[in-house]
Curated annotation (Swiss-Prot):
Name used for this protein in its record: Probable 4-amino-4-deoxy-L-arabinose-phosphoundecaprenol flippase subunit ArnE
Gene, per the UniProt record: arnE
UniProt keyword annotation of Lipid metabolism present: yes
Assembly description: Heterodimer of ArnE and ArnF.
Native organism taxonomy: Bacteria, Pseudomonadati, Pseudomonadota, Gammaproteobacteria, Enterobacterales
Major location (coarse): membrane
Keywords: Cell inner membrane, Cell membrane, Lipid A biosynthesis, Lipid biosynthesis, Lipid metabolism, Lipopolysaccharide biosynthesis, Membrane, Transmembrane, Transmembrane helix, Transport
Organism of origin: Photorhabdus laumondii subsp. laumondii (strain DSM 15139 / CIP 105565 / TT01) (Photorhabdus luminescens subsp. laumondii)
Signal peptide per UniProt: none
Amino acid sequence: MISFSLLLLISLLTCAGQLCQKQAVMCWRSDVYQRASALKWLIGAVILLAVGMLFWLRLLQILPLGIAYPMLSINFIMVTLAGKFFYQEKAGIKHWSGVVFIMLGILLMSLNE
């Protein structure tokens, strides 16, 4: 149970870091005055991703790499959903089908655990 909680925390931190990167790029494309805020978003991204990596190293002490790394694919699901809800990004049927297959794979791996 602790490994699943840790994996979920890592995924949330990584997803948040990716969203900060996206926000930084969007600020950078704006006018010159908003470029300073892009740096703040980038710093936030680095911090979130670094903390996620520290928890990842802890998770690798608990789970084998062959189990932990594929289960990290939950990030694809989180980032896809976040892109849709926060940035109104479009994803086609093939993309959503891939997300469903990832979810099935994660389910199968967690049943083996």
